Amino acid sequence: MIPGEIITPAGEIELNVGRPTIKLQVSNTGDRPIQVGSHYHFYEVNTALNFDREQARGMRLDIPAGTAVRFEPGDEKEIILVPLVGTRQVYGFNAKINGNL
């Protein structure tokens, strides 16, 4: 073993296996790029992103932890969301929930 070496089991790591997902079309109507991180409550993202917000309540991007999706001005893309898990309490972000989902 080399100091700091990480030994992982063989095979692929599957994220969010068995969790329900939804697909949404999202467009950036603003004049600046918007980047959304993997665990940001998607319901509370920048208001320049246009999509069905109610469907995104309690959801986050279905992407690896620590990564993000970037929306350039005028961009429209389909994203996949998964439910936030754990206590299903959301605090901070844009203060639209600040409590139980």
From Swiss-Prot:
Coiled-coil regions listed in the entry: none
Reactions catalysed according to its record: urea + 2 H2O + H(+) = hydrogencarbonate + 2 NH4(+)
Protein location: Cytoplasm
Keyword entries, A-Z: Cytoplasm, Hydrolase
InterPro entries xrefs: Urease_beta-like, Urease_betasu_sf, Urease_subunit
Metabolic or biological pathway, per its Swiss-Prot or TrEMBL entry: Nitrogen metabolism; urea degradation; CO(2) and NH(3) from urea (urease route): step 1/1
EC number: 3.5.1.5
GO molecular function, one term: urease activity
Major location (coarse): cytoplasm
Class in the EC hierarchy, top level: hydrolase
Manganese as UniProt keyword: no
Cysteine pairs bridged by disulfides in the record: none
GO biological process: urea catabolic process
CC terms in the record's Gene Ontology section: urease complex
Residue ranges crossing the lipid bilayer per the database entry: none
Entry superkingdom: Bacteria
Subunit annotation: Heterotrimer of UreA (gamma), UreB (beta) and UreC (alpha) subunits. Three heterotrimers associate to form the active enzyme.
Protein family per UniProt: Belongs to the urease beta subunit family.
Protein name: Urease subunit beta
